[in-house]
């Protein structure tokens, strides 16, 4: 059984303040910290061989917190791919106690452009709720100077196919800690959702989604699988 675990980061400070965040590098709120720890509890008995996060701190910290009580007791270490010598471990004994963690901006949240840092209710009052709904939930319409969900998938899906999927095919169990829209674009592909179906896909913060790769398709499971 080969597993793919997806987790939207815990609540961030700007989630709490109802602000558009996008690529702005905002940390977790106190609630988000607790969500990340609770998420870890729900997956702590699931095997994990590799971790992938975005380059944004809320994604990274969520993954690290989620792994603190993992039953394997293995320690995540960040692989600096631009300088692999920096993170090379020269002890086989220690290597066996570690889990590699890779970061990529391909997994970053969709970039919200001119909306970043603005209050969502205030933006709705300024531009109208229907326009903001199109920016936030439509598949191909992007906010000013930002990305649509389609645009986000144009970077997320190639990275998944080139870097992550081959590991799943090798039987490696993968944990991805990322963002609402980067994960929505990925789930759209995994579950073969239409452009209309993905519009209603909501991913709460800090709640894992578990898939099994059967060798031919992805099957969704409850996190309690472990």
Swiss-Prot record:
Gene3D superfamilies assigned: Phosphoglycerate mutase-like
Active site positions: 9, 109
Protein known as: 2,3-bisphosphoglycerate-dependent phosphoglycerate mutase
InterPro entries: His_Pase_superF_clade-1 (IPR013078), His_PPase_superfam (IPR029033), PG/BPGM_mutase_AS (IPR001345), Phosphogly_mut1 (IPR005952)
SUPFAM superfamilies on file: Phosphoglycerate mutase-like (SSF53254)
List of residues binding substrate: 8-15, 21-22, 58, 109-112, 120, 136-137, 180-181
GO BP: gluconeogenesis; glycolytic process
């Amino acid at each position: 059984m080969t597993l793919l675990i997806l987790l939207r980061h815990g609540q961030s400070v700007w989630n709490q303040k109802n602000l558009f965040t996008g690529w702005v590098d905002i940390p977790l709120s106190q609630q988000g910290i607790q969500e990340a720890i609770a998420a870890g509890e729900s997956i702590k008995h699931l095997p994990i061989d590799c971790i992938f996060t975005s380059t944004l701190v809320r994604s990274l910290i969520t993954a690290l917190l989620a792994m603190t009580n993992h039953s394997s007791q293995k320690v995540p270490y960040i692989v600096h791919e631009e300088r692999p010598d920096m993170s090379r471990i020269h002890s086989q004994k220690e290597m066996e106690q570690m889990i590699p963690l890779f970061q990529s901006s391909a997994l970053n949240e969709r970039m919200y452009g001119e909306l970043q840092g603005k209050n969502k209710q205030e933006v709705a009052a300024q531009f109208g709720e229907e326009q903001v709904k199109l920016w936030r939930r439509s598949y191909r319409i992007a906010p000013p100077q930002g990305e649509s969900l389609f645009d986000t998938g144009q970077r997320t899906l190639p990275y998944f196919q080139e870097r992550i999927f081959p590991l799943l095919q090798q039987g490696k169990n993968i944990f991805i800690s990322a963002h609402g829209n980067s994960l929505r674009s990925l789930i759209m592909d995994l579950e073969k959702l239409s452009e209309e179906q993905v519009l209603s896909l909501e991913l709460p913060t800090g709640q894992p989604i578990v898939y099994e790769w059967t060798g031919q398709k992805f099957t969704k499971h409850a996190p309690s699988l472990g």
